[in-house]
From Swiss-Prot:
Top class in the EC scheme: translocase
Protein's recorded name: Na(+)-translocating NADH-quinone reductase subunit E
Gene Ontology terms describing biological process: respiratory electron transport chain; sodium ion transport
E.C. code: 7.2.1.1
Organism the protein comes from: Actinobacillus pleuropneumoniae serotype 5b (strain L20)
Residue runs in coiled coils: none
Subunit organization: Composed of six subunits; NqrA, NqrB, NqrC, NqrD, NqrE and NqrF.
Bilayer disposition of the protein: Multi-pass membrane protein
Function: NQR complex catalyzes the reduction of ubiquinone-1 to ubiquinol by two successive reactions, coupled with the transport of Na(+) ions from the cytoplasm to the periplasm. NqrA to NqrE are probably involved in the second step, the conversion of ubisemiquinone to ubiquinol.
Top-rank taxon, per record: Bacteria
Length: 198
């Protein structure tokens, strides 16, 4: 149990997808204007990562890995396309659920919801799972932790962005300029976790 807790904490803080590896920055910067929208997208990323990482772990272990189907047959060259296909299917299902049950959030997320399919944080989580050879339970914990860390980062950035609306930001830095500086400072803060061994 302690191993899984340390893996979760490590994936949220020490190896944060957004602020340590800078993965998923396109949606991270674009949807961080309002806390409510950022929170909704963060929940969507948690759900997709929490399902995509273990689902792809099963596909990799039982289909793609060397000798998984037939001894001596290595289908790992299909990793990239297979993982993207599984992620795309999961995002489509999530999109249909949000459209049916949460239409306001679906409208607020707009084009960024389908872009979760190609969000490199999602694919990065799956790739790290393969590289680190996580088992199924570790994949579930890692997927949920990585999604939680990404959500924590985007909600924190959205909160800071909302507060900066009322501050006197120099004209040349308004918009993405001050956002890049803020993300850099947040990344420096998260870098302080890098020396922690769990």
């Amino acid at each position: 149990m302690e191993h899984y807790l340390s893996l979760f904490v490590k994936s949220v803080f020490i190896e944060n997808m957004a602020l340590s590896f800078f993965l998923g920055m396109c949606t991270f910067l674009a949807v961080s204007k309002k806390v409510s929208t950022a929170f909704g997208l963060g929940i969507a990323v948690i759900v997709v990562l929490g399902i995509a990482v273990p689902a792809n772990q099963l596909v990799y272990t039982h289909v793609l890995k060397d000798g998984a189907l037939v001894e001596g047959v290595d289908l790992s060259f299909l990793n990239f396309i297979t993982f993207i296909g599984v992620i795309a299917a999961l995002v489509q299902i999530l999109e249909m659920i949000l459209d049916k049950f949460f239409p306001a959030l679906y409208s607020a997320l707009g084009i960024f919801l389908p872009l979760i399919t190609v969000n490199c944080a999602i694919f990065g989580g799956v790739s790290f799972m393969v590289q680190r050879e996580y088992n199924f339970t570790e994949s579930v914990v890692y997927g949920l932790g990585a999604g939680t860390g990404w959500m924590l980062a985007i909600v924190a950035l959205a909160g800071l962005t909302e507060k900066m609306k009322y501050s006197d930001v120099p004209a040349g830095l308004r918009g993405l300029g001050i956002t890049f500086i803020t993300v850099g400072l947040m990344a420096l803060g998260f870098m302080s976790f890098s020396g922690i061994q769990l």
